[in-house]
Curated annotation (Swiss-Prot):
<dbReference type="InterPro" id="IPR050900">
    <property type="entry name" value="Transposase_IS3/IS150/IS904"/>
</dbReference>
<dbReference type="InterPro" id="IPR001584">
    <property type="entry name" value="Integrase_cat-core"/>
</dbReference>
<dbReference type="InterPro" id="IPR009057">
    <property type="entry name" value="Homeodomain-like_sf"/>
</dbReference>
<keyword id="KW-0233">DNA recombination</keyword>
<comment type="similarity">
    <text>Belongs to the transposase 8 family.</text>
</comment>
<keyword id="KW-0255">Endonuclease</keyword>
<dbReference type="GO" id="GO:0015074">
    <property type="term" value="P:DNA integration"/>
</dbReference>
<dbReference type="InterPro" id="IPR048020">
    <property type="entry name" value="Transpos_IS3"/>
</dbReference>
<feature type="binding site">
    <location>
        <position position="417"/>
    </location>
    <ligand>
        <name>Mg(2+)</name>
    </ligand>
</feature>
<dbReference type="Pfam" id="PF13276">
    <property type="entry name" value="HTH_21"/>
</dbReference>
<keyword id="KW-0229">DNA integration</keyword>
<feature type="coiled-coil region">
    <location>
        <begin position="172"/>
        <end position="216"/>
    </location>
</feature>
<dbReference type="GO" id="GO:0004519">
    <property type="term" value="F:endonuclease activity"/>
</dbReference>
<dbReference type="GO" id="GO:0003677">
    <property type="term" value="F:DNA binding"/>
</dbReference>
<keyword id="KW-0175">Coiled coil</keyword>
<comment type="function">
    <text>Probably involved in the transposition of insertion sequence IS1353.</text>
</comment>
<keyword id="KW-0540">Nuclease</keyword>
Length: 514
């Protein structure tokens, strides 16, 4: 449900854009067309939108009330006939009007009783026990419980089966009453035990959700010993320790060992904070290997296994959902060139092998297209361009930026797929002027350009997929993508480069001045 501010923002933007429905939905990312039409109709009718739902209570005049009461008296004292004839009010309202205006005609329902209250199985058990152990009459027991005498005997029939009528004189040695009494007491004890067990299981789930931030659907047996110990400590005041340990399948010795460990100071407190900071500052996309490299670069040496354990305990998990790929293939405007790289994406020097491609990023506000050039030497994004249309200008401008970074004598191979952007005359003319050697993948074979596809995968799994892009405009998205690529070149750790970013690696090997 959209708030008042969201609905009013959508209507005002729609009017500001000249009542263009598609432009409004593309910029905001919400709502549906029918919802926006309904909001607009309400706004034009009231010059405002309702701030919430209000329950309207219908009001009747004194004349309407008197007319209904008179009709009831004149037409034979029938509530249904009066309501059908006049079309109002409800039966309860009409009865109230009769009591107020003509109380002498108000009818009292004979034999009415208090509303029926649902009784638990435990209450029924106790009532049946009292019935069988009574000294007085069954009516006295029924009055004490608050039910009728037939109801009491119905409970007995359901719980004990059909009980034969007792003879007026008790035979010697007849113990059926005592046996039923003992059976009822045993069943009552079992029900109380089962009730306590269910209460304990529910309390365990609630505490696991509260203390350990677990989902209510989690299986308590899948918790770690440390987490189980926290739950037991929180519930010891309410439930016996033995029952809690049994319910969580936790050995007594393990429980006291974990309690002892928790009293000791955590020697990884500082490391936990540093790991959490690194994870959050780097788009929540660092796994344990790059976290370990970042710690080493910061002068903090910790075992890789410790890093993995601490990340698991802090629940620092990289999310990697998948989306469909964008295809730029549009026929064969010019002949394709051969595949010169043949999936060899290793380069001994910068600016010898370049890769390029085009990808689509879709959010509620619309689509954005990213066109980069990746250097096979270290994965540096040499140049890139971001736009809202996958046209020739997007890729041609990107190529012009990349060519300006070349030094005299550098003429790399530029590899792409068979998309139409790389087969148009303007692209071919630019590559010939810069003396670049063109190379192309086979048709529909993404592994032939796997290194560039890998960059797109990292961009989407680290920046796009883990976040909610509702209410984000395309301009803001392009700004964030540009900032991500700068971070990718300057700060993002690559394990294959010794835990450095591409630019840091070039500084380290002397290929770029500081």
């Amino acid at each position: 449900m959209y708030s008042y501010e969201d609905r009013l923002r959508a209507v005002r933007l729609y009017l500001k854009l000249g009542r263009r429905m598609s432009a409004t939905l593309r910029q905001l990312g919400y709502p549906t067309k029918n919802s926006l039409k309904a909001w607009l109709a309400e706004f034009e009718r009231n010059q405002d939108l309702r701030r919430g739902y209000q329950r309207i209570k219908r009001q009747y005049t004194d004349e309407q009330k008197q007319r209904a009461v008179d009709h009831y008296i004149e037409q034979g004292y029938c509530l249904s006939h009066t309501i059908r004839s006049l079309g109002y009010p409800s039966r309860e309202a009409l009865r109230a009007w009769i009591r107020d205006l003509r109380p002498e005609f108000a009818r009292t329902v004979v034999g009415s009783s208090a509303p029926t209250v649902a009784r638990s199985r435990l209450e029924k058990q106790q009532a049946v026990i009292a019935l069988n152990l009574r000294v007085g009459s069954a009516k006295d027991v029924a009055d004490t419980v608050g039910v009728s005498r037939p109801t009491l005997y119905n409970w007995q029939h359901r719980l004990l089966g059909k009980v034969p009528l007792k003879p007026m004189t008790k035979k010697k040695g007849d113990t059926s009453l005592e046996q039923r009494h003992e059976a009822l007491l045993r069943e009552l004890a079992e029900l109380e035990s089962q009730n306590q067990r269910l209460r304990m299981e529910n309390a365990i789930l609630e505490k696991a959700s509260e203390l350990i931030k677990k989902d209510m659907g989690i299986n308590p047996l899948e918790l770690t010993s440390r987490e189980k110990t926290k739950v037991v400590d929180a519930l010891r005041v309410t439930f016996p320790l033995a029952n809690l340990l049994c319910g969580l399948k936790l050995a007594r010795s393990t429980y006291f060992y974990q309690r002892l460990r928790q009293t000791r100071p955590d020697k990884y407190t500082q490391v936990r904070e540093v790991i959490r900071t690194i994870f959050e500052d780097n788009y929540r996309c660092y796994g344990y290997r790059r976290i370990d490299s970042a710690l080493r670069l910061g002068g903090m040496r910790v075992s890789e296994k410790v890093v993995r354990r601490l990340m698991a305990q802090e629940r620092l998990v990289v999310r990697t959902p998948r989306r469909r790929r964008f295809s730029a293939y549009a026929g064969d405007p010019t002949p394709a060139v051969p595949n010169l790289l043949n999936r060899d994406f290793h380069a001994s020097a910068p600016n010898t092998k370049w890769l390029t491609d085009l990808t689509e990023i879709h959010i509620p506000a619309g689509k954005v297209y990213v066109s980069p050039i990746v250097d096979c030497f270290d994965g540096l994004v040499v140049a890139w361009n971001i736009g809202t249309s996958p046209d020739a200008n997007l890729v041609n401008t990107m190529l012009d930026h990349a060519v300006r970074t070349l030094r005299p004598g550098e003429h790399p191979v530029i590899h792409s797929d068979r998309g139409s952007h790389y087969r148009w005359p303007a692209w071919i003319r630019r590559t010939e002027n810069a003396q670049l050697t063109r190379s192309m993948s086979k048709k529909g074979c993404s592994p032939d350009n796997a290194a560039c596809e890998g960059f797109f995968g990292r961009l989407k799994t680290e920046l796009i997929y883990p976040r909610n892009w509702q209410h984000v405009t395309l301009k803001d998205l392009m700004t964030r993508i540009d900032a991500y690529i700068h971070w990718y070149n300057e700060r993002r750790i690559k394990v294959s480069l010794g835990g450095r970013s591409p630019i840091e690696y070039r500084h380290a090997v002397g290929l770029m001045s500081v």
